[in-house]
Amino acid sequence: GCIAWTMMEYKEHRFTLHNFESIPEKFDEKTIGDFFFSHHLHHMFANQEYRIVIPLWHICKVIIPTFVVLYFLFGTVVALDFNAGLGLAQLFYDSMHFWFHFGGDFKIKFFQDLKEKHMRHHYRDKTKDFGVTSSFWDYVFDTI
């Protein structure tokens, strides 16, 4: 689940939240529209605390259907294990993202490099550096 999360994070961030062509004509504030605009407000006002973490309802829209599909395909253990990984990765993402914006520098180079990469995404080039918790997919898709 944790590994799958990195791909979901990259895909969502790059192809949904930064793809202006994907904006539906009519938004339902309970669906992607609210999250899409919230993300762009986060870019405009990057240091507002309430725009840093992903809303719980958006997380549930991913975890609940994933659990149901995995439960019917592979059973309870796989569904629980995979979703536990997704949940842990989400907590890691929210914690790291919050720290990137409001914490100091990291003593561990890996985390400091991720923070600097994320700040580049915000302030230099919004078409690069989509991975927040990992640079792996940015290297794979040449967006580093």
PLM-predicted stretches and their roles:
Residues M7-I144:
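Membrane-embedded catalytic scaffold of the fatty acid hydroxylase/desaturase
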Residues G1-T6:
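Loop-to-helix transition at the N-terminal end of transmembrane alpha-helices
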